[in-house]
């Protein structure tokens, strides 16, 4: 059956093809018949017109323009030499009677001879529209194309006046020409762009040449205007003659390019966010989370209007008083830890915490913007990191999320932004906050950011190298405006802290060649355990040190690491921090390092954190960290 069906199918196809060809040829012959009928009438009219207008045109054109009589004779000869073009003249002459014929001819003429066509159709066919007075006025604009080729002054005149004349056109030929241009310009006039340019002085009418400078200045803005006749026929050939090198970008609204590319693999759910890029903050519900770093020229003064703390509601803010001030800066991490209470922190969070980039040279702190409306999770993300600051200190947007009455857990994500500066790695991990469904406070600090290293000591944590630890000690007491911090933080504790941090750095550098747990991430565990688990005062003592307040209501803080680490690290970290989970301190002793007696994380502990296969021995351990029992 297949062999018998194939010949039938082919024969049917051939029959259909022949039928279509026959129909097309019949239509074409009919059109040509009409053209041949109108051609004779046109020739008679043309001869009479040239006899009438010949003497006056010599005075009309003058100077360097060609002889009028030669123009008339050449135009008449042109009708005999190029029958298709002359038939084009013919149909344009008799458009009122043969509108359909004219339309069909123009489509065939454009498709068949796109370069010769404008010579006649545009010379005469366009004039049929532009001069509504009568056929007597058709021929002088026919020679404006000649004027254009021979005289520059005539070029300017012809570009100005015929466009005005064509603004009066009410005929149907302009609509036909526009329709044909929209159909055929992409194919035909692209291929012959150069020849069209050479022929444009002779072939294109004055309107096209008049609009050519406009289209060259602003390429392709009006490629397909709806009802504007002048721009449509004029700008389409001009934009295609550009060769596509200057595309029309006016209608394409590109978003501003992100300096740090978004991670295509990050899941939208915040608890599982692999925060290896700042784009994950968009999923974490941080309205203030930005899309990357500022340009080097951007200063903190430029950003306070954009950066606003993410706040759930004023009731939640006042009831919950849990502030997160993730201020991350390479050189002086502790300088940003200004301890305030909830409402004052809320208003100063956009910048009071985040404008100090380096301990040597902190930039001026701009006035923070007023806090956003109660639910401001839809606000546009602010820029995360300012690269152009001299000390390489990225400015972080404030992420102040105050706990609601149901104590929704906070998930602080620190997606590592890619470093933008060639000399340093300033791409500090911005911290986004999200209220997830888990009741426990899960502070996600990214573990994949090599950008957390200071330019001065690339392998040590910011501000904790031996050279910069004195700065860390001095700025720690100076920035903490709270009297408790100034009284309790002694030089001995600060030095011990810096030594412990250096010890962490040495341990970390031994195993973090893959930058899975860079020095910044280990300090997230250690300092949060040593310094930050104070239950009464908010404020981040360190960008790596995740010190959060519970105001007596949040004794349990779980540090989890997303980044490149598996999600099971939250359980492992909870097991490692189980010893300090229930510690909650009053404002009487703010830095209870001696009371905590926390040993620094050993290599075994860090390997345990690195182990993705490790699970909690007791699954009930997770329940001890939950907040619903409060």
Curated annotation (Swiss-Prot):
InterPro entries registered for this protein in UniProt: TORC, TORC_C, TORC_M, TORC_N
Pfam families: TORC_C, TORC_M, TORC_N
Residue ranges with Basic and acidic residues bias: 194-208
Composition bias type Pro residues, residue spans: 257-270, 361-384
GO cellular component term of the entry, any: nuclear body
Residues the UniProt record annotates as site (Required for ubiquitination and degradation): 571
Induction or repression: Expressed in a circadian manner in the suprachiasmatic nucleus (SCN) of the brain. Expression is highest during the day and reaches a nadir during the early subjective night.
Recorded coiled-coil stretches: none
Tissue specificity as recorded in UniProt: Highly expressed in specific regions of the brain including the cortex, hippocampus and striatum.
Listed GO MF terms: cAMP response element binding protein binding
Residue ranges with Polar residues bias: 151-174, 292-301, 310-328, 413-428, 443-475
PTM comment text: Phosphorylation/dephosphorylation states of Ser-151 are required for regulating transduction of CREB activity. TORCs are inactive when phosphorylated, and active when dephosphorylated at this site. This primary site of phosphorylation is mediated by SIKs (SIK1 and SIK2), is regulated by cAMP and calcium levels and is dependent on the phosphorylation of SIKs by LKB1.
Cellular localization per UniProt: Cytoplasm; Nucleus
Modification Phosphothreonine occurs at: 149, 161
Motif stretch (Nuclear export signal): 242-258
Phosphoserine modification, residue list: 64, 113, 151
Family that this chain belongs to: Belongs to the TORC family.
Function: Transcriptional coactivator for CREB1 which activates transcription through both consensus and variant cAMP response element (CRE) sites. Acts as a coactivator, in the SIK/TORC signaling pathway, being active when dephosphorylated. Acts independently of CREB1 'Ser-133' phosphorylation. Enhances the interaction of CREB1 with TAF4. Regulates the expression of specific CREB-activated genes such as the steroidogenic gene, StAR. Potent coactivator of PGC1alpha and inducer of mitochondrial biogenesis in muscle cells.
Protein name per the record: CREB-regulated transcription coactivator 1
Organism of provenance: Mus musculus (Mouse)
């Amino acid at each position: 059956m297949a062999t018998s069906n194939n010949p039938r199918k082919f024969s049917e196809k051939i029959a259909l093809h022949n039928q279509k060809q026959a129909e097309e040829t019949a239509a074409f012959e009919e059109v040509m018949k009409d053209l041949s009928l109108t051609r004779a009438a046109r020739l008679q009219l043309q001869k009479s017109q040239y006899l009438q207008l010949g003497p006056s045109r010599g005075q009309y054109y003058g100077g360097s323009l060609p002889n009028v009589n030669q123009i008339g004779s050449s135009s008449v000869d042109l009708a005999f030499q190029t029958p298709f073009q002359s038939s084009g003249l013919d149909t344009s002459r008799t458009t009122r009677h043969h509108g359909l014929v004219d339309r069909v001819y123009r489509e065939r003429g454009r498709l068949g001879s796109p370069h010769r066509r404008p010579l006649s159709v545009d010379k005469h066919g366009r004039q049929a529209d532009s001069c509504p007075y009568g056929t007597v006025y058709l021929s002088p604009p026919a020679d404006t194309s000649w004027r254009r080729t021979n005289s520059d002054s005539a070029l300017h005149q012809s570009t100005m006046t015929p466009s005005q004349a064509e603004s009066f056109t009410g005929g149907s030929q302009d609509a036909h020409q526009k329709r044909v241009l929209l159909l055929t310009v992409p194919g035909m006039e692209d291929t012959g762009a150069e020849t069209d340019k050479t022929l444009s002085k002779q072939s294109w009418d004055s309107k096209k040449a008049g609009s050519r400078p406009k289209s060259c200045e602003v390429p392709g803005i009006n490629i397909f205007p709806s009802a504007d006749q002048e721009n449509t026929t004029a700008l389409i050939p001009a934009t295609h003659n550009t060769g596509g090198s200057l595309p029309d970008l006016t209608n394409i609204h590109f978003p501003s390019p992100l300096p740090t590319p978004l991670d295509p693999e990050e899941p939208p759910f915040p608890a599982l966010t692999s925060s290896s890029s700042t784009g994950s903050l968009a999923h974490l519900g941080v309205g203030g989370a930005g899309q990357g770093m500022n340009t080097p020229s951007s200063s903190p003064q430029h950003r306070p209007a954009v950066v606003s703390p993410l706040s759930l509601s004023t009731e939640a803010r006042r009831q919950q008083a849990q502030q997160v001030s993730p201020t991350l800066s390479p050189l002086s991490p502790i300088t940003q830890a200004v301890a305030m209470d909830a409402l004052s922190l809320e208003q100063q969070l956009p910048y009071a915490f985040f404008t100090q980039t380096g301990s040597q040279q902190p930039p001026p702190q701009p006035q923070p913007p007023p806090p956003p409306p109660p639910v401001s999770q839809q606000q546009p993300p602010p820029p995360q990191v300012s690269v152009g600051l001299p000390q390489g200190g990225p400015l972080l947007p404030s992420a102040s999320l105050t706990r609601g009455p149901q104590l929704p857990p906070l998930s602080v994500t620190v997606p590592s932004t890619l470093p933008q500066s060639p000399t340093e790695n300033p791409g500090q991990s911005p911290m986004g906050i999200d209220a997830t469904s888990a009741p426990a406070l899960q502070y996600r600090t990214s573990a994949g950011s090599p950008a957390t290293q200071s330019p001065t000591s690339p392998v040590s944590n910011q501000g904790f190298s031996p050279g910069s630890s004195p700065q860390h000690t001095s700025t720690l007491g100076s920035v903490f405006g709270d009297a408790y911090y100034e009284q309790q933080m002694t030089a001995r504790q600060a030095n011990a802290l810096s030594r412990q941090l250096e010890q962490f750095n040495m341990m970390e550098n031994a195993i973090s060649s893959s930058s899975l747990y860079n020095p910044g991430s280990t300090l997230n565990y250690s300092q949060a355990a040593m310094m930050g688990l104070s239950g009464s005062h908010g404020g981040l003592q360190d960008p790596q040190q995740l010190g959060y307040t519970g105001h007596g209501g949040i004794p349990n803080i779980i540090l989890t690491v997303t980044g490149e680490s598996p999600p099971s690290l939250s359980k492992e970290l909870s097991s490692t921090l189980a010893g300090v989970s229930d510690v909650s301190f009053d404002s009487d002793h703010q830095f209870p390092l001696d009371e905590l007696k926390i040993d620094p994380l050993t290599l075994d502990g860090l390997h345990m954190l690195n182990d993705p296969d490790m699970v909690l021995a007791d699954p009930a351990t997770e329940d001890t960290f939950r907040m619903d029992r409060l």
